[in-house]
Amino acid sequence: MHYPKVYDVIVIGGGHAGTEAALAAARMGRQTLLLTHNIETLGQMSCNPAIGGIGKSHLVREIDALGGAMALAADKGGIQFRILNSRKGAAVRATRAQADRVRYKAAIRETLENQANLDIFQQAADDLIVEGDTVKGVVTQMGIRFDAKTVVLTTGTFLGGVIHVGLEKSSGGRAGDPPSIALAQRLRELKLPVGRLKTGTPPRIDARSVDFSVMTTQPGDFPSPVMSFMGDVSMHPEQVNCYITHTNEKTHDIIRGGLDRSPMYTGVIEGVGPRYCPSIEDKIHRFSDKDSHQVFLEPEGLDTHELYPNGISTSLPFDVQFELVRSIRGMENAHILRPGYAIEYDYFNPQALKFTLETKAINGLYFAGQINGTTGYEEAGAQGLLAGLNAARRAWEQEEWTPKRDQAYMGVLVDDLITLGTKEPYRMFTSRAEYRLMLREDNADQRLTTIGRELGLVDDVRWAAYCEKMEAVERETSRLQHVWAAPNNPMGKKFVEMTGADLSKECSAIDLLKRPNINFGQIAELTGSEVSQQVGEQIEIAVKYEGYINRQHEDVAQLKRLEETKIPADFDYDVVSGLSREITQKLKTVRPETLAQASRIPGVTPAAVQLVMITIRKNNMTKKTA
């Protein structure tokens, strides 16, 4: 059947990338179709039941600032919230939400089903319709043809997915779900640069068989933080504890004894696993000097006894999994509900993409999520939103948009993938960003919500809330600049009494806030401030880090000069005099779009960038005089 409706955007896959892509396109007013192999698994958390963490929560806040669904779903489904790095600087603080899988998934599905301009259809996609070098639509498993101006592919681990438990293997995109074999084959036919990666998950444990009394209790923070700028603590369901235990020498001996049947150590798995989320067998091998490793027992939800033992991801045979689990303190009688496994899947070299996440080879075809070599819900969601908004803009022949490295962690993510490529699952960290003082969790809305409004991603309710917040920040900052404390006035005396600090001359409340040991809470008490915690936090960070932030703005201004120098798409690097063969080859492989991107390619020297710039200028002069 040839489906009668022509869509602006078709999104294949209903995971974290797919849902954000579909919602973004639909919010922008495009007729959008979300194809999923199973409506019941929309927004499913395939691995750990958590959203956020170091570097990752920054992405979640950016998705949220652009009107995305992930942060609000985390607030509606979060059963424990914590601020990580709370004693460190504002740039590296991160929010983490332990999520109830069922509640999180329900929140995502509710958002999808109530989104205007969005149709959902349950069918696996088997084929892409490509005419010349342009995608025209999709053919499903049943042979239904859907036509579209653009297609976003967010297939997760389903492309050619193979599940491994010990030396046993089976086809699967996730435990209990079939892989996408036909689509994987079709993509290989299109001559896109394909590789194999792997990821894994731990065995799930029945909480009733665990002795928590011998473990360390890990409660959430109180008062509980929220993930979304539109979130509220009243959205949170019941809050629960997590628990910490450790592996031991006996555990490690059991694992070593099973390595001869490990698919990772017998060459059965060829795909590279995530460096920063290694399996337990990988930890034992790589960190052989360590006597133990932490295991975090995380509840999967409020209405289930299932626990996620974070830290023992494994693909060892089940009999070895059984022994290693029962060797851990507090888990001597543990009952395994589901075995751990590894999954190997196809991904495509992200260097074959444009910055909009459109493939260079096929016009109108966009990739997002694990298909691009990333790992994590947050990385997937960020790419999905960007791919969805750019597919939507292309569908209406509008100029596409991707944030720069100084605008968002999303920009860092995309630039890293396309400039550097990846041969292992890519995970976001704050350390990957040069301008992390400017790219904080708390100011994601300041950086992106105005842009999101212009793009059509941000609705009236969010926009009104953002404007109200920014007006409050402005008003309160101005007020504090005109409230004065002096050694002999009541406010000055109260300040000295409250803080024990010296006050030798008259200071504004803003000047007092600049002091290292003074926080906004103290200033609020001193001056009778009634603004929200969010507004107070923004003011405090802006005041305390003003000098550092100004220096970063100067660095960004220098970088922008390189960003503004575009490299023509057909630029011939072979004619650049003085470039080494190695650097020429690297530039021809990546084909950077700007001099700034060229400067970030490993091995490309500042001198080489200078030579390219000189050649571009010469070419431009020649064109002008011709």
Curated annotation (Swiss-Prot):
Its cofactor is FAD. Keywords: Cytoplasm, FAD, Flavoprotein, NAD, tRNA processing. Its main location: cytoplasm. One of its GO terms (cellular component) is cytosol. FAD binds at residues 13-18. It is found in: Cytoplasm. The keyword NAD applies. InterPro entries: FAD/NAD-bd_sf, GIDA_C_N, MnmG, MnmG-rel, MnmG-rel_CS, MnmG_C, MnmG_C_subdom, MnmG_C_subdom_sf. One of its GO terms (molecular function) is flavin adenine dinucleotide binding. Gene3D superfamilies: FAD/NAD(P)-binding domain (3.50.50.60), GidA associated domain, C-terminal subdomain (1.10.150.570), tRNA uridine 5-carboxymethylaminomethyl modification enzyme MnmG/GidA (1.10.10.1800). PROSITE patterns: GIDA_1, GIDA_2. It comes from the Bacteria. NAD(+) binds at residues 273-287. GO terms for biological process: tRNA methylation; tRNA wobble uridine modification. NAD-binding protein involved in the addition of a carboxymethylaminomethyl (cmnm) group at the wobble position (U34) of certain tRNAs, forming tRNA-cmnm(5)s(2)U34. Belongs to the MnmG family. Homodimer. Heterotetramer of two MnmE and two MnmG subunits. This is tRNA uridine 5-carboxymethylaminomethyl modification enzyme MnmG.
